[in-house]
From Swiss-Prot:
One of its GO terms (biological process) is positive regulation of cilium assembly. It comes from the Eukaryota. It comes from Bos taurus. The lineage of its organism: Eukaryota, Metazoa, Chordata, Craniata, Vertebrata. Residues 1-10 have a biased composition (Polar residues). This is Protein phosphatase 1 regulatory subunit 35. One of its GO terms (molecular function) is phosphatase binding. The gene is PPP1R35. Pfam families: PPP1R35_C (PF15503).
Length: 266
């Protein structure tokens, strides 16, 4: 970026300023002890010797305005040079002092390190109490101390005390004498109900069936007096009369007949 002095600006029409190229600013000579900055970090800026208030007294208002605008643009685009300090050598000495006493060092969190569990901590507390007592353990004092520290015991005592204080006096007094005579009927009835409850449920008998009504009268279809039946009368001369012979039947037919009659009745 190029920087121009006030003497290199010339006024043109309507007060506009035109930059006239001039010699570039010379960089500073490096100090003997300072390191040479890298090319990528060389943000140099030539200092301006003129202040915003200085200028030629015989300049016109338009030229003064253009010069002020030009100076503002040059001031906005200034560059800054950063002097990098030499890299400090690695110190092999002891680490710096610890922080203040208020900051406590963090304990190493190692999962392999054993920690005191509840039973071990309780045993250590018991050993410390025995050591403090000097070999003489006061059981009553220990119980009293434990009850005083126990949260559940304190809550239970508070509830009992609160319940006793909040109950009205009328509910705590006896209104009638309690009878010591055992009611026999009530005890027997209760025992009977318990026994009946243990019994399996009984099946209910089916309701009785209604007898069947009379059947339809078949005489309405015909007149009984006009009914005749014929029986054949066969006679054969010369043949002996027929003899009746009993035919044996199996014993199962009796039950079959009974079953058939029951089916007909149903």
């Amino acid at each position: 970026m190029m920087v121009y002095n006030g003497s290199q600006l010339e006024s043109v029409e309507e007060g506009e300023a035109v930059a006239v190229p001039g010699p570039p600013p010379e960089p500073r000579a490096p100090e003997p002890g300072a390191p040479v900055p890298e090319p990528g970090l060389d943000l140099s800026l030539s200092p301006r010797s003129e202040s915003p208030g200085r200028g030629r007294p015989n300049c016109s208002p338009g030229r003064r305005k253009g010069r002020a605008d030009r100076r503002g643009g040059a001031r906005k685009g200034r560059q800054v040079r950063f002097l990098l300090a030499p890299p400090s050598p690695v110190r092999s000495g002891p680490p710096p002092a610890a922080a203040s006493s208020s900051e406590k060092p963090e304990a190493p969190q190692d999962l392999g390190t054993p920690v005191q569990q509840s039973s071990l901590a309780l045993s250590l507390e018991l050993q410390a109490a025995r050591a403090a007592a000097g070999g003489q353990f006061d059981a009553a004092k220990a119980v009293e101390e434990q009850l005083r520290k126990s949260f559940q015991t304190r809550c239970g005592l508070e509830e009992s005390v609160t319940e006793g204080l909040n109950v009205p006096r009328s509910k705590r007094l006896f209104r009638d004498l309690v009878s010591l005579q055992v009611p026999e009927e009530q005890v027997l009835n209760a025992a009977l109900r318990e026994k009946l409850a243990l019994l399996p449920p009984q099946a209910r008998a089916p309701p009785p069936k209604e007898p069947p009504g009379p059947g339809p009268d078949m005489t309405i279809l015909c007149d009984p007096e006009t009914l005749f039946y014929e029986s054949p009368h066969l006679t054969l001369e010369g043949l002996p009369p027929l003899r009746l012979q009993l035919r044996p039947r199996p014993s199962e037919d009796t039950f079959l007949m009974h079953r058939t009659l029951r089916r007909w009745e149903a």
